[in-house]
Swiss-Prot record:
The active site is at K64 (proton donor). InterPro entries: Aldolase_TIM (IPR013785), OMPdecase (IPR014732), OMPdecase_AS (IPR018089), OMPdecase_bac (IPR047596), OMPdeCOase_dom (IPR001754), RibuloseP-bd_barrel (IPR011060). This is Orotidine 5'-phosphate decarboxylase. One of its GO terms (biological process) is 'de novo' UMP biosynthetic process. Keywords: Decarboxylase, Lyase, Pyrimidine biosynthesis. It catalyses: orotidine 5'-phosphate + H(+) = UMP + CO2.
Length: 232
């Protein structure tokens, strides 16, 4: 049974172990999970995951694996062996890649992390997609990739809250993980397709990834408590 009682995932977007753990020590594992991304993982490797788990946190390993099917599946297997709660892959890697990842987790006898697909990054708008040869709205590409993820048997998707309602309608069994969440009054930063925590949950999101509004707050514990109160 999960120790965390909320849908909040706090992004530990730091370059060093000490900085990440300084924030983690101010947070309550009952009120949030934590996300380890590329910068922190590249700096600290698997040790940071073990340390966070020892502190009671469930860990979302946000490395967005994208490679040939076997290589990606072996990376997902390695993540599972670390004991992470959630791991993600890019849906644009295709059906065979995602299926291979799901199958390697099914072969495990122990706990299995949630396998989540990344659709379109929340920083991308139509002009960004056009730059890589896709002259369509982000939501159209999200729905295309979501259908592939569903077919491959993934547990859920990373998506903008603005796509959550359409995705829940089309794929109600998929769990939706939403970055780009900004509590009312927060700076937008480099996220483009964003909503507040309450708006995101109402739209169909299951988990909310929140970074700078908590990590850069003068009092991160209070900032987290404020978000918990907002969505209560």
């Amino acid at each position: 049974m999960s120790v965390c009682q909320t849908p909040i995932i706090v992004a530990l977007d730091y370059p060093t172990r000490d900085a990440a753990l300084k924030l983690a020590d101010q947070l309550d594992p009952k009120l949030c999970r934590v996300k380890v991304g590329k910068e922190l993982f590249t700096s600290c490797a698997a040790e940071i995951v073990g340390t966070l788990r020892d502190k009671g946190f469930e860990v979302f390993l946000d490395l967005k694996f994208h490679d040939i099917p076997n290589t990606t599946a072996m990376a997902v297997k390695a993540a599972a062996e670390m004991g992470v709660w959630m791991v993600n892959v890019h849906c644009s890697g295709g059906l065979r890649m995602m299926t291979a990842c799901r199958e390697v987790l099914e072969q495990r006898s122990g706990p299995k992390p949630l396998l989540i697909g990344v659709t379109v990054l929340t920083s991308m708008e139509r002009e960004d997609l056009a730059g890589i040869g896709l002259d369509i709205e982000p939501q159209e590409q999200v729905l295309r990739l979501a259908a592939l993820a569903q077919k491959a048997g993934l547990d859920g998707l990373v998506c903008s809250a603005l796509e959550a309602q359409a995705l829940k309608t089309a794929h109600p069994s998929l769990q939706l993980v939403t970055p780009g969440i900004r509590p009312a009054g927060s700076a937008q930063d480099d996220q483009r397709r964003i909503l507040t925590p309450r708006q995101a949950l109402d739209a169909g999101s299951d988990y909310l990834v929140i970074g700078r509004p908590i990590s850069q707050a003068a009092d991160p514990a209070k900032a987290l408590a404020d978000v918990v109160a907002e969505i209560a």
